A protein has these predicted regions:
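Glycine-/small-residue-enriched capping loops at alpha/beta junctions
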Residues: 1-116
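Phosphate/ribose-phosphate-bearing ligand recognition and processing surfaces
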Residues: 93-184
Length: 184
C-alpha cells in the first residue's frame, strides 16, 4: 500500500496502511485494556505475532503495579517482533465526554516514555478507533492539536512517527488533517 509523509518540526510523520506488528521501529504502541489482557484487535495481533512473552510481561506488570489507568502506559519487551519495545496504552472507550482527554494523556505518556527510552522511531495504531469504538473524527482532531502543541518546539531523540492501520481510508483522513498543520 502507498505511504505518505509530512515533516513537522524535527520529526517525520509517516502514514501507512499496514500491519503494525511488521513495522521495523524501536517501539510499537498497543491499544490495550487496563488489565493488559491482549485478546482482540491490535493487542491480540501483537501477542500472536510477538509471542506469549509479551502477555507474560504484561501480566507481571499488572501484578506488580496494578491496572493501567485510562491514558496511562506500560512498557514491555517486543518478543519476536522487529521492535525493541511495546508501549501499551489504555485509550478512550466509546464516545464519552472524557474520551478526548484520555487520548491526549495517552499521546503525552507515549511520547514522554519514548523520550525516556531514547526511541528514534515509533509506530502507533489509531488508538481507540477500532474495537473500543472511539470516533475517528474525534481521534483525528485530538491528534492534530496534540502534534501541533507537542512537536512545535520538540527536542528529543524521536525522528520518525508512523501512524498505521489496516484501513487505508482511516489513515488518509488522519494524514489530510495533519497536512493542514503544515499549510497553516
Amino acid at each position: 500500500m502507498g505511504e505518505r509523509e509530512i515533516v513537522f518540526g524535527r520529526v517525520r510523520f509517516v502514514f501507512r496502511s499496514s500491519d503494525i506488528t511488521r513495522e521495523n521501529v524501536d517501539a510499537i504502541v498497543n491499544a490495550a485494556n487496563s488489565h493488559l489482557k491482549h485478546g482482540g484487535g491490535v493487542a491480540g495481533a501483537i501477542v500472536r505475532a510477538g509471542g506469549y512473552e509479551i502477555q507474560a510481561e504484561s501480566d507481571e506488570y499488572v501484578a506488580k503495579h496494578g491496572p493501567v489507568p485510562p491514558g496511562g502506559v506500560a512498557v514491555t519487551g517486543a518478543g519476536k517482533l522487529p521492535a525493541k519495545f511495546v508501549i501499551h496504552t489504555v485509550g478512550p472507550i466509546g464516545d464519552s465526554p472524557s474520551s478526548d482527554e484520555v487520548l491526549r494523556n495517552c499521546l503525552l505518556n507515549i511520547f514522554e516514555t519514548a523520550k525516556q527510552l531514547s526511541i528514534k522511531s515509533i509506530a502507533l495504531p489509531l488508538v481507540g478507533t477500532g474495537i473500543f469504538g472511539y470516533p475517528l473524527e474525534r481521534f483525528v482532531n485530538v491528534v492534530k492539536e496534540f502534534i501541533k502543541e507537542y512537536f512545535t518546539n520538540y527536542v528529543g531523540p524521536l525522528e520518525t512517527v508512523i501512524f498505521c492501520d489496516i484501513d487505508p481510508s482511516k489513515i488518509k483522513k488522519l494524514r489530510e488533517a495533519l497536512e493542514q498543520i503544515i499549510q497553516s
